Amino acid sequence: MKALLVLGLLAAVGYFVFHNGEDLDWRSLSASLTAPVQRIARHDSSDGLIHTGAACPPSHASGDAAVQFSTSPDGQAEALVLSVIDGAHTELDVAAYELTNARIAEHLIARARAGVQVRVVLDRSQLDGRASKLSRLAAAGIPVRIDLAVPLMHDKLIVADGDTTQTGSMNYTQAGAHRNAENVLVVWHHPELATAARAAWTRLWEESQPWTPG
């Protein structure tokens, strides 16, 4: 039950942030939080709605929303991020304070080579070259922008195929995945949340500057 309360609070905070606290549809928010809790109360974990520590997308009927939550430093959080990337078919919009994790960068490049539209916004700290995968992504043809409009762009966000959202505390780094105590939350197949997350990502993309080598 504590886990449900935590997820409910995370969802409420996310909803508030993505909507900038304005014109909130509280009835829709209440329904979106209540329905999953009611379904969990009626079913055990085999229902496929809430999963913890799993590295692969949950098994559920196409179009059904599901939530996964994983932590580091045991590698499960990184595996969950990779499952979101690998599961994308059309587009991946990424906003990252840091992107120095070689596995995550290579999986993004692999999806781009498979025809998925991949776009990445990074914080200005990635310009210093220390383990940044900025050049590697750009060399693979992935559009990369640097956010110079704010002092710190601290997001860790991926929106996949316009219906799946990944966020959490974990930076896309080796330390975040394998040394620090971090968390990753994924909401699969929830277009309304993904639309709000995509709008937040788009604001970052539009305020950022395209990066080119040299």
Protein language model features and the residues they cover:
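Short, structured motif recognition centered on aromatic/hydrophobic residues
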Residues: 85, 97, 157, 197, ...
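Short, small/polar-rich loop/turn modules that mediate ligand/substrate recognition or access, typified
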Residues: 2-71, 75, 79, 202-214
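General small-molecule cofactor/ligand-binding pocket signal
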Residues: 70, 121, 145-147
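Solvent-exposed loop/turn segments at secondary-structure junctions
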Residues: 98-102, 124-128, 150-153, 164-165, ...
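Primarily the HKD phosphodiesterase
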Residues: 81-143
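Signature of lipid phosphatidyltransferase scaffolds
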Residues: 165-214
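Short, solvent-exposed loop/turn segments at the edges of secondary structure
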Residues: 139, 152-153, 160, 179-180
